[in-house]
């Protein structure tokens, strides 16, 4: 039975589930209805993974922009 992806799962879990579904589908031994359910869940997981990547990219862009707005000063250690 196909599972619904949890929106709170992390990217690595999503990717592992997607890879598992791809492996099942590549075997080619699933009945049509089960293959369609697996494919549907795979599409949902791919979308969720893409959203996670976009969120990470946005966070990185925000951090980089903050760095550009506040340039780093030379470090003067305890010399």
Curated annotation (Swiss-Prot):
Enzyme Commission number(s) from the entry: 3.1.11.6
Signal peptide: none
Reaction catalysis annotation: Exonucleolytic cleavage in either 5'- to 3'- or 3'- to 5'-direction to yield nucleoside 5'-phosphates
Cellular component aspect of the GO annotation: cytosol; exodeoxyribonuclease VII complex
Molecular function GO labels: exodeoxyribonuclease VII activity
UniProtKB keywords: Cytoplasm, Exonuclease, Hydrolase, Nuclease
A single GO BP: DNA catabolic process
Cystine residue pairs: none
Coiled-coil region list: none
Compartments, record wording: Cytoplasm
Family designation: Belongs to the XseB family.
Record-linked PANTHER family: EXODEOXYRIBONUCLEASE 7 SMALL SUBUNIT
Subunit structure as annotated in this protein's UniProt entry: Heterooligomer composed of large and small subunits.
The protein's name in its UniProt record: Exodeoxyribonuclease 7 small subunit
Taxonomic placement: Bacteria, Pseudomonadati, Pseudomonadota, Gammaproteobacteria, Pasteurellales
Gene assigned in the entry: xseB
